[in-house]
């Protein structure tokens, strides 16, 4: 069982011609292997994210219910509406059970494998602009999630040329709350100026 390992680059059936696994099967397999989460990073899109988060929320409903009930019990003990012999011991036991339940939660990491234009996303002039490099972009918080949505949306609406593309200036503009990872064989070498 792999308890300390999390895949940060996973394609689902929403990565056409590359991924074939369903979201549910990926999550189930990761959980079966003892993983605490996975990052869904489909090529140039976030089409599977809603399905991913909904499925993980469904799988997490048991532990979340336990946590809610335990917190309610603690509040009742503190308010005096729940009877028990040793309040401090009971609260400590409830808090320990909360930690156990939290350790059962599966973490859905939202991301995208983005295509980055060699020059700018607005240039669409033949072969140099057809290719570029790839980056894995992960949201580490709500701000990052919103910035990732902006990057992917702009890649489709402004940068599309053979595929949805972003560029360095967009990454610099919307970097807050994001973690950016390079892919060895298809990435531009890491540069300090990529994201400040």
Task: Please place each PLM-identified region on the residue numbering.
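Hydrophobic alpha-helical segments, chiefly the membrane-spanning helices
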Residues: 195-196
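Phosphodiester-processing cores and adjacent nucleic acid-binding clamps
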Residues: 1-187, 191
């Amino acid at each position: 069982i792999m308890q300390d390992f999390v895949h940060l680059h996973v394609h689902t059936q929403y990565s056409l011609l590359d991924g074939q696994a369903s979201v549910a099967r990926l999550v189930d397999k990761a959980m079966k292997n003892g993983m605490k989460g996975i990052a869904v990073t489909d090529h140039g899109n976030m089409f599977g994210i809603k399905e991913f988060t909904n499925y993980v929320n469904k799988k997490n409903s048991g532990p979340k219910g336990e946590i809610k009930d335990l917190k309610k019990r603690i509040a009742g003990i503190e308010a005096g509406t729940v009877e028990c012999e040793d309040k401090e011991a009971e609260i400590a036991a409830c808090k320990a059970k909360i930690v156990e339940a939290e350790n059962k939660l599966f973490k859905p990491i939202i991301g995208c494998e983005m295509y980055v234009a060699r020059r700018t996303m607005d240039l669409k002039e033949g072969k140099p602009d057809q290719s570029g490099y790839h980056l894995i972009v992960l949201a580490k918080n709500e701000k990052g999630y919103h910035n990732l949505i902006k990057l992917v949306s702009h890649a489709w609406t402004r940068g599309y040329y053979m595929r949805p593309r972003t560029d360095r200036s967009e990454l610099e503009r919307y970097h807050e709350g994001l973690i950016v990872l390079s892919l060895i064989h298809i990435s531009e070498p890491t540069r300090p100026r990529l994201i400040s």
